[in-house]
């Protein structure tokens, strides 16, 4: 990749793809991005997942945000993302807590009130 590709994450944030690697053995794309959100909070996992899925052309449920690192006071975050080709491959390699993180599913505590 000779030129960094730009992705619009939200109204106040955009990202640059630093590294995009296709892991054909596992059947996933491994992406490292740098998100610029100066003067605003770190974008949510849902916003980043939505932006990456439209950029890659994959379903949102096949995108897993492995981690987001933001330096204190900095308006720049680094994120590591995996995009899988199939749901069953995703379930073999990614822990459930990462797959579910950032989703708006009700937990047992919220349901019982």
UniProtKB/Swiss-Prot annotation:
Record-level GO BP terms: translation
Positions of transmembrane segments: none
Pfam families, per database record: Ribosomal_S24e
Ribosomal protein found in the keyword field: yes
CC per GO annotation: ribonucleoprotein complex; ribosome
rRNA processing listed as a keyword: no
Gene3D superfamilies: 3.30.70.330
GO molecular function, one term: structural constituent of ribosome
Alphabetical UniProt keywords: Ribonucleoprotein, Ribosomal protein
Protein family: Belongs to the eukaryotic ribosomal protein eS24 family.
Name the record gives this protein: Small ribosomal subunit protein eS24
Species name: Metallosphaera sedula (strain ATCC 51363 / DSM 5348 / JCM 9185 / NBRC 15509 / TH2)
Gene (name only): rps24e
């Amino acid at each position: 990749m000779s030129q960094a590709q730009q992705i619009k994450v939200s109204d106040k944030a955009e990202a640059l793809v630093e590294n995009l690697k296709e892991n054909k053995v596992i059947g996933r794309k491994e992406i490292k991005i740098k998100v610029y959100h100066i003067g605003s909070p770190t974008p949510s996992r849902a916003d980043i997942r939505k932006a990456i899925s439209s950029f890659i052309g994959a379903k949102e449920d096949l995108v897993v945000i492995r981690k987001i690192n933001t330096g204190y006071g900095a308006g720049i975050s680094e994120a590591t993302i995996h995009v899988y080709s199939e749901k069953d491959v995703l379930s073999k390699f990614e822990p459930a807590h990462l797959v579910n993180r950032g989703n708006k599913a009700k937990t047992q505590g919220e349901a019982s009130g």
